[in-house]
Amino acid sequence: MATLSAARRLGTILAAATIVVYAQVARYDFVNWDDPEYVLQNPAVSAGLSLGGVAWAFTHRHGETWHPITSLSHMLDCQLYGLWPGGHHLTSVLLHVCATLLLFGVLCALSGEPAPSAFVAGAFALHPLRAESVAWVAERKDVLAGVLWMSTMWLYVAWVRRPSPRRYGAVVVTFMLGLMAKPMVVTLPLVLLLIDAWPLGRSLPLRRRVVDKLPLLALAGVVSVVTIVAQQPAVVSLEKVGVTDRLANAIVAFAWYVQKTVWPSGLAVFYPLELPVPVRSVAVSGLFVACVTAVAWRARRTRPWLFVGWLWYLVALLPVIGLVRVGDQAVADRYTYLPGIGLSLMVAWSGVELASRWPAMKPVVGAVATVLLIALAAATWVQVGYWRDNVTLYERALRVTHDNFVAHTNLGSALLAENRVSDALQHYREALRINPTAGVAHANVGVALAASGDHAAAMAAFERALELDGRDAATHVRVADLLAGEGHLADAIAHYQQAAALEPTSPAVHNNLGFLLAAQGNLTEAVELAPAEPRNRMNYARALARSGRRGDAIAELRELLRRRPDWQAAERELSQVLAADPDPARRTEAVALAEELVRTATTPDAELLAILAVAYEGAARFADALRAWSEALTAARATGRTDLVPGLEAAVAACRVRSQVGGTR
């Protein structure tokens, strides 16, 4: 009873401490690395949960891998919170708390010792290396996989102690869910083999214990193949990073993660891969790993926690150690989320041994463990704070790393989003200096130059980017936008067509191409490009209206609204087309539609009020039009729409004149 009471008290403290350290993320935004792909710019996810979304999750890659359970969790967040980043962050925090409590419960169930179990769970929850997994929305897969990893372990322990087909079935199902949250869970069957030896102490022959894991190993094999296929576009080729370099970096990484676990300073969102890997680093790291492995092997019977903890660490790291490379990072904090537990096991039960050999040391061991966890929590609070926004995150990375292409690139994009064009260009040029053969680096410089108004230099940068990587659809789009802005529609269309061929499923590319085709007068071709795409139909309707075919435009817009009755953009367009029609009945309909749009708006909308004013003028209701124009001007000033103010001021003045002279239309 006393043990149970102590476990509950420690569990409550663990949960509270974890929430306190990470709750600050509720105020944080999304970051511009992976979060757009995972949530913000992924219509299948941002639309929330639906049958179509569930089907998409199980049949498509998401973030260059297959993890449908993670995709569904992002969809559920969008269903609950929309695109409020705080909600997405808090879900990750709650999942991390759950993983922590499950780990604590599993270790208590395995060992019957709450104190060392609490230390391991506390180090798992509160170590600065965990900040990336919890504070980064795109890393939802880590915390979700953590919950399912711990759940599988707990169910496995229950099955070992009271075997039954139903209990084993629960183990298999939960493990499969874990694999579908993050494929890194494939190593769990091997970790279960380790805990068979300690602390479970199963006396069955090794062969029998392996047979127990065969269904799990089979599932792991299938998901490994699926993952390799799904990640193929993102896998770094052997020509770029050879086998020798991969092995060298893996050896250094095994030691680096231990170093950062012991002394977590200089942590960053991205660590550039240095090639060739320094021979000295490989030698020292290899010697360290070999020595610890030898010590753990020799202690496998007398101190089994050293052997189990060290092999847990090594085995769990294998999928992400870089032998199969996805991305250009040398190491990553998030990769320690599950492997780091093994290192904590080694420390915690060494403390137990120390206290049992010298009972007088027990209070000292407890005090040291408590101070360590408090220090880790304080360091994690600081580390989580770096995730408050893009600029803070990448500036931190640049302070603690060298020649960081990713940090310069992403910081440039963040600064450009804040309209700090000169600062953005500086970081884009630094990225270009680091990797002058990267097409994306030239393209980013082009984006910043275009934003600064230097279109000639921007075009030169884009052309160089396409020379290096002609299959970059985004650069073709940027060139097309620049050409279209200068009136070179034919050339712009050619680049959009190349972008559409490279990204045949991109709605934005097809929409913009359709708009340009319609502007050029190729109405039929514009619609045939993607006949079911609503925005293409909208562009078609606009082109019809501009060419004087108002009746056809109205029919097209009515059909759009029949299919999507809540599409306000189509309602706005229809109101404007109706207001310009010579038929008085249609002008009256324009007024009714515009009035309804204004009435249902949650806040004063200058553009909606302007549409209403146009509708009133079309119906010769000039007093009402003057009032609507004035309200639109007030709304524009109140909401900071300074771009609309001059035009609205002119409209108010013109309408006032028309109303005074009896209203000439």
Model-derived regions, located:
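Conserved alpha-helical positions within TPR/SEL1-like repeat arrays
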Residues: F405-A417, V440-A451, A474-G485, A508-F515, ...
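Polytopic membrane enzymes that build or remodel cell-surface glycoconjugates and lipids
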Residues: M1-G453, E467, A474, N512
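TPR-repeat structural position
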Residues: W387, V421, H455, L489, ...
